[in-house]
A protein has these predicted regions:
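Histidine-acidic metal/acid-base catalytic patches
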Residues: 2-80, 199-309
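Short glycine-centered, acidic/aromatic-flanked micro-motifs in structured strand/loop junctions
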Residues: 88, 120, 156, 192-194, ...
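Short active-site-proximal "capping" loops at secondary-structure junctions
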Residues: 58, 89-93, 121
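Active-site acidic/histidine proton-transfer and metal-coordination neighborhood
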Residues: 14-24, 38-46, 103-118, 122-219, ...
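Short strand->helix junction
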Residues: 91-92, 123, 255, 285
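Conserved beta-strand positions in the central sheet of alpha/beta enzyme cores
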Residues: 85, 115-117, 153, 249, ...
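Charged helix-capping and loop-helix junction motifs
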Residues: 67-69, 98-101, 130-137, 166-176, ...
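Glycine-rich, proline-tolerant flexible connector loops at the mouths of alpha/beta enzymes
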Residues: 85-103, 159-162
Length: 309
């Protein structure tokens, strides 16, 4: 993924509104989740934590032309995962025949597509550029439908020079609200990722959810992407946004090199009664051929430990 903005730069940009305190975390969780299950291994039968894999995990090999999207589907069989999140960057085309071939290959191999993922930036000061972004999202909603996938990951992006956080949020709300009206007619959910830019803070993600107010919108939750602040570390921000998670991307190392406490993360998903995919998104230094299986095995073990499946 692209290099992040520095924490100080981010906080300077968003100002006081970025301070996600414990009250927000508790309020967001308690207002949407009614589960009383504990986080003890194997006790939460409401959560359905399913192991998946992002095509992005093989980005090094895909960029080098050593793998294709067809190979990613075949890798899913080797890994024993239920689904693949199809990152759009390496599609040969968006022609119907190509998309149909991917869908058919996945069906024959017993693999489903948990979703598709595109790179977008809705924080455009120019209205004509925002219109172009909306059309691009609509295009990929159609692609997602052709694949038979239920979910499309989008980005909000970084603020342009001179723009305020509230402007960026408004531009994103205006664009994604219309996009959700389109995707909803096809039964496709849009998930904005807490990725580089305005959505690296839980409060902004929650504001987007509440202002867009669509059953076809939520948060594509990457557990390593939130910028920790004194009032809320990454784990607190994960918990705050979990009730609205549409898909989860899993890495085991934060950007600063610190290991993620996965045994702390999984109970949060269990208590929130999350039902969906925990998709490996490997970005380590090790070759993906050996690094991805190791991450997938960690995810499988934890899904069995904290889920009914």
């Amino acid at each position: 993924m692209p290099e992040r903005i520095h924490r100080r730069e981010f906080l300077k940009t968003v100002g006081p509104a970025a301070l996600v305190g414990s009250e927000l975390v508790r309020g967001a969780h308690s207002s949407t989740s009614t589960s009383t299950a504990t986080s003890e291994p194997g006790t939460n039968r409401n959560a359905r934590l399913l192991t998946g894999c992002c095509a992005y995990s093989y980005s090094k090999l895909l960029k080098a032309g050593k793998m294709t999207m067809e190979d990613v589907i075949r890798k899913a069989v080797e890994l024993g995962v239920a689904a693949v999140d199809m990152t759009a960057y390496w599609f040969k085309s968006t022609e119907p025949a190509y998309l149909a071939s991917l869908r058919h290959l996945a069906y024959k191999d017993g693999v489903c597509f948990s979703g598709a993922a595109i790179g977008t930036s809705t924080v455009q000061a120019d209205a004509s550029k925002r219109a172009q972004v909306l059309e691009e999202i609509r295009k990929w909603i159609d692609v997602t439908e052709a694949l038979g996938a239920p979910h499309l990951r989008v980005f909000a992006g970084k603020l342009p020079d001179g723009a305020t956080m509230q402007q960026g949020i408004k531009w994103t709300v205006d664009t994604l609200k219309v996009a959700c009206e389109y995707s909803g007619k096809k039964g496709i959910t849009l998930g904005v990722e807490n990725h580089e830019g305005i959505t690296q803070n839980a409060e902004v993600c929650l504001e987007l959810v509440h202002r867009i107010a669509s059953p076809y919108f939520g948060i594509n939750l990457d557990i390593t992407n939130f910028i920790a602040i004194p009032q809320a570390d990454a784990y607190a921000q994960i918990e705050a946004t979990l009730p609205f998670a549409t898909h989860a991307h899993i890495r085991d190392v934060f950007e600063n090199g610190q290991a993620v406490d996965l045994d702390r993360v999984w109970p949060l998903f269990a208590r929130a009664s999350y039902r969906g995919f925990m998709s490996a998104e490997y970005e380590g230094e090790e070759d993906p051929s050996t690094g991805v299986p190791k991450l997938v095995e960690k995810i499988k073990t934890l899904c069995r430990k904290y889920s009914s499946v």
